[in-house]
């Protein structure tokens, strides 16, 4: 009998899933680039805008705009699937080069409905940090 309790205790609890309010549309409020190859401090990119829709069915739509100096805003659109495990997030999509994935971590603060996504960059150690806030109250689906 004791070994059954021991075996049950060794089984890991499933990783928590995000709350229902996590699945919504967010507005980008900030983007910081961390480039360890340059020796300069993290750079906050000006003129960040757009939305990120995360759906409970695992699909997402990203529409990001960045102000790129005198050339004006640059628009990025990306559609695909995402998964979360504990604090990890993976975005899978297909672009002109074929299937790809962006990996990183996320932190969701339910009280303020703020989301921070940190995506791994290249070379290893570089990263992009995105700050977002939910655009509307959760629908409770």
What annotation goes with each model-predicted range?
Residues 4-12:
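Sec-dependent N-terminal signal peptides
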Residues 14-77, 85-141:
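Lipid interaction determinants
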